[in-house]
Amino acid sequence: MSDEKSWFQEIHFLFPEGKDKALTFSYDDAQVYDRRLVSIFDQHDMKATFHLNSSTLDREGFVTRSEIKQLYVNHEIACHGVTHPFFNQLSQAQTVTELYEDRRALEQYSGRIVRGFSYPFGVYSDNLIETALKLGIVYSRTVNSTMDFALPTDFMRWNPTCHHDQVTDELLADFLNPPPFRGMALLYIWGHSYEFERDGKWAHIHGICEKLQGRKDIWYATNIEIYDYVTAVRGLIMSVDGHILYNASARPVWFMTSGKMYCLAAGEQMSFD
């Protein structure tokens, strides 16, 4: 083999518009405190994913079916099981029903395609993952904090950076001031909106948003937007010598090579001499 360094060894993929950081939030259970949390996110131009249990909608203390289309208009709606069950205590038939009916109901109420999921109580198994994939789920969030900013290797075992209680000034400083070798960095924060009310910590989420808002180097995205983009990056087709790159996906992909940034459009092929 040639000792010459291949072009593809120098490529550095980036988030949309050439940004090197991404931020996403994920909140479960759809209690009425989602209304206040959504307002805070919208005020600061944040993007989040809200995981809903379709059977609790309209119950006291929870958001209503009629409001979710407008309430979450700037955010993603995702599954959390019809009844928030312990999936390790269900039969296979119950597992299918919990996933399928939750997805069906949420799509009906929201008018959108629902593809995301988060594991109630953080409980999951290989069988649950296999079943979810067959039912059209493409990613699912755990409750296992990594305390880092790495992209997930397995979107069906998507470990977040941390719960919002674990967000510190030191963590944010590490995210915002990366070493040059880090590459694409994702800060993924999760929790429940009722925790801010219960613990008297609404100022905490306000502070997080204020420190992270309006930055030109951050892509503010929902969970499904992260999934779709990273999947597009990982699906790029490259020639053996690394001089031809083809984007077979339906979305543009950004990268840098030899000190120059490129945007490879959907369906585009690019050659480098």
Which positions does each model-derived feature cover?
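Boundary/entry segment of secreted carbohydrate-active catalytic domains
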Residues: M1-R35
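C-terminal domain-boundary segment and adjacent tail
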Residues: S6-F15, E107, Y139-D148, F181, ...
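Hydrophobic "anchor" residues on beta-strands that sit immediately upstream
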Residues: T24-F25, E76, I218
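Active-site metal-binding loops of divalent metal-dependent hydrolases
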Residues: Y27-A30, G81, S193, N223
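A short, Lys/Arg-enriched amphipathic alpha-helix followed by its capping loop at the start of a domain
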Residues: I40-M46, I208-K211
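Metal-dependent polysaccharide deacetylase catalytic core of the NodB/CE4 family, i.e.
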Residues: D42-V138, N144-W158, C162, M184-S193
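Non-membrane alpha-helical structural segments and their capping/turn regions in soluble enzymes
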Residues: Q92-T97, D169, D199-W202
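A short, acidic, amphipathic alpha-helical segment used as a generic capping/interface helix at domain edges
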Residues: D169-P180
